[in-house]
Amino acid sequence: MEKLKRFLPEDQYEKLAAINNPYLHEFLAEWIEWLKPSKVFVCTDSPEDEEYVRWKALYYGEEKMLEMPRHTVHYDNYYDQARDKANTKLLVPKGVTLPFLNTMDREEGLKEIREIMKGIMKGKELFICFFVLGPRNSIFTIPAVQLTDSAYVAHSEFLLYRKGYEEFKRLGPTKNFLKFVHSAGELDERKTSKNLDKRRIYIDLVDETVYSANTQYGGNTIGLKKLAFRLTIQRAVREGWLSEHMFLMRVNGPNGRKTYFTGAYPSMCGKTSTAMIPWENIVGDDLVFIKNVDGTARAVNVEIGVFGIIEGINEKDDPIIWQVLHSPVEIIFSNVLVKDGKPYWNGMGIEIPDEGENHSGKWWRGKRDKEGNEIPPSHKNARFTVRLEAFPNLDKEALENPCGVEVGGMIFGGRDPDTWPPVREAFDWEHGVITMGASLESETTAATLGKEGVRAFNPMSILDFLSVHLGDYIRNYLEFGRKLKKKPKIFAVNYFLRENGKWLNEKLDKAVWLKWMELRVHGDVEAIETPIGYIPKYEDLRELFKQVLNKEYKKEDYEKQFKIRVPELLAKIDRIWNIYEPIGNIPEELFKQLEEERERLLKAREKYGDYISPFSLL
């Protein structure tokens, strides 16, 4: 405490002295001394402290005001527009190897990051902010402290997370908190990070601390988002619960019944559009904690806000988000085009001006970057940051419930043109975890990999954020379900089937799949048993299409969508098997489930041929 007293003005020192936690004080003293900020501000939970951060984001030029009240815009460096996978490393003890993951020797990594961060905040203001992941004062709560010299990062976290200063006071001398140290580093004249060659995001799994330097892009800097996620996955696997990359939503059943679903979808597979279906309710769009509470799986949204991709959001397809983005609620737009104080983005469905300011500085149509690429009006990864309370379809009670909500179903959403049917239900927990969650793939489009139709393996949509061995992660999933008295049903969906180049489903058909899943959770409708799980009966879907979309659902459409495509399904089993086999430390159950599914498909092929009509299986 003596050190802190030396570094801080009295009013800021008193805020820290009110927290009885020597571990926290020691950590803060060490880093304030190392970073050498010219000024330190400690954020409590008061609205005044939040307002101070908001004002500082404008004062330091990291954000600018827009025409609509409470809207601001932030720009990242032209070359700092996405998660930096190459320089995001998990620091692990010598000799530890984790397949698929970018690891580095811990001692080496700590030495390098300390060197980069030495005195990096000279002439800058350090903000010390306290937050919690999950609701406060609950079995889900994980406290976290963020050190940053970016008022934009601190402001973003106030929109995305619950404040945690009082929680730190309540908890007293605990070591059980996550730590984040961030510096944007030296800034250029546009107030964006300059030294991108020294951009580093190092995640210390031993000390549960994340260091991030010379970057501002949210995915690299907003500590509590995907950086904390790596730490909570490790914790969940160690302690026997689930920390997942999933939405949490309420599907409204007959007679006012409320059923909650979680959903894991790789990007471009329909995650946001599912969570935002207009007549259902959202609890969260990105991260959930799921715990066993008295034998039941209960889930909470880790966050209270949305850090969403804005590209393509338009009034017709995304009426709810569109309404929020045009309301005078607090929103930070990032890396969009601004003209006359109004934000514009690619694919918004209205005319975009031919000039303005964007992530490249002064912009005009046809402008090219130094590599000769044409610069679009907004970056494809441009974002909006807003609190969930701005959404009219928010289930506020579920968001704030410290006990979480009971999970009725878990959905895994893949993307392929010719393999998975639009919706199906697993036979049981193990079957769902392995053949749906652990087998998740998404077909990439030509734009991302230069090759149409490459299937990217992404189990549980978590591969980019994994911090433990994949085998341990899957083993924990299986164990978690086995200990539940009441298991959620597991479903898989695929909105992207094609035939002769044409989509087999329309965008809103997913609303019907949700209603069917809700009915199945409660055993209200029967289903057809197939080699890959249960699929809906035609009559039930016909009725739901009429009820939900006021649309006639034709028998031939049902047959095309739900036929069992044996050759493609067998090819997928081989692909998944060949990915897991060389890894080692994979649960035996995975190969057992894949083998059983293969046998069921081969048996069905003998009887019905390569492509099986759902009507043959009645």
Swiss-Prot record:
Catalysis performed (reactions): oxaloacetate + GTP = phosphoenolpyruvate + GDP + CO2
UniProt cofactor note: Binds 1 Mn(2+) ion per subunit.
Keywords attached to this entry: Cytoplasm, Decarboxylase, Gluconeogenesis, GTP-binding, Lyase, Manganese, Metal-binding, Nucleotide-binding
Binding site for Mn(2+): 226, 245, 286
Principal subcellular localization: cytoplasm
Binding site for GTP: 268-273, 383, 415
One GO cellular component term: cytosol
Pfam families: PEPCK_GTP, PEPCK_N
Keyword Lyase appears in the UniProt entry: yes
Gene Ontology biological process terms in this record: cellular response to glucose stimulus; gluconeogenesis; glycerol biosynthetic process from pyruvate; oxaloacetate metabolic process; propionate catabolic process; response to lipid; response to starvation
Function description: Catalyzes the conversion of oxaloacetate (OAA) to phosphoenolpyruvate (PEP), the rate-limiting step in the metabolic pathway that produces glucose from lactate and other precursors derived from the citric acid cycle.
Protein name stated in the entry: Phosphoenolpyruvate carboxykinase [GTP]
Native source organism of the sequence: Pyrococcus abyssi (strain GE5 / Orsay)
Gene name per UniProt: pckG
